Curated annotation (Swiss-Prot):
Pfam families: ARF7EP_C (PF14949). This is ARL14 effector protein. The gene is ARL14EP. The modification Phosphoserine is found at S183. It is found in: Cytoplasm.
């Protein structure tokens, strides 16, 4: 069994080290093997104090560097305005925007997080006077951008996996179990398991995220029981029910094709 990487140890998620969700290979890199840009992104996205001798496993490279943006499925909601997850028409916060907006609003925005049109409009309305000033940042060299970012005192944003499954964005999802009384869907018998011990649907073997998007790689905080980012309010392993539908920002209803 391989030892956990330094990132897993510091973030107290050693159970996730060397997983093969997003890569077929297992192993380590030392942080000095990363580019300066990747090391900076890792530092900002984890809130960790890093040194070149620290190690990162291939799984955490995927989570925090290679696929971090893809794994952000909803608006980061910096102003606490959303009652439901906003998942449409998102745009990524880049390094320059993270620097500028964090300083402007006095709250941490991490490169790779995403904003919805509503939050973008709030930001644009708040910083209109400084638009010219903001544009001047774009031509800056990577070195100056990195220096500016390093000068900011970021606190640990908290990994998505550090939160309890009932808190934060997860509680904003309105999920309907197919076992709900009066449901027009098939009711799963109380003693019948819908998911196997690995969290896969027994009848199809599918690794379906509780957001019901069949292409989703996982958009929830990691499950404290199994570590998967595809579990909603309760771990899918050996679960006896599944979600019939969810409602997302804008009132759109997504139905579970596998519930009937």
């Amino acid at each position: 069994m391989m030892d956990p990487c330094s990132v897993g140890v510091q973030l107290r998620t050693t159970n996730e080290c060397h997983k093969t969700y997003y890569t077929r290979h297992t192993g380590f890199k030392t942080l000095q093997e990363l580019s300066s840009n990747d090391m900076l992104l890792l530092q900002l996205r984890t809130g960790m104090t890093l040194s070149g001798n620290n190690t990162i496993c291939f799984h955490h490279v995927k989570i925090y560097i290679d696929r971090f943006e893809d794994l952000q499925k909803s608006c980061c909601d910096p102003f606490n305005i959303h009652k439901k997850l906003a998942k449409k028409n998102l745009h990524v916060i880049d390094l320059d925007d993270a620097t500028f907006l964090s300083a402007k609003f006095g709250r941490q925005l991490v490169p790779g997080w995403k904003l919805c049109p509503k939050c973008t409009q709030i930001i644009n309305g708040s910083v209109d006077v400084d638009t010219e000033d903001r544009q001047k940042r774009k031509p800056e060299s990577d070195g100056r951008t990195a220096k500016a970012l390093r000068s900011l005192q970021f606190t640990n944003p908290g990994r998505q996996t550090e939160f309890a499954p009932e808190t934060g964005k997860r509680e904003k999802r309105r999920l309907t179990k197919n076992a709900t009384a009066g449901s027009d869907r098939q009711v799963i018998p109380a003693k019948s398991k819908v998911y196997d011990s690995q969290g896969l649907l027994i009848f199809s073997g599918m690794d379906l995220c509780d957001c019901l998007d069949e292409d989703c790689l996982g958009c929830f905080y990691a499950c404290p029981a199994c570590g998967s980012t595809k579990c909603g309010a309760e771990c899918r392993c050996d679960r006896k029910w599944l979600y019939e539908q969810i409602e997302i920002e804008g009132g759109e209803i997504i139905h579970n094709k596998h519930a009937g």
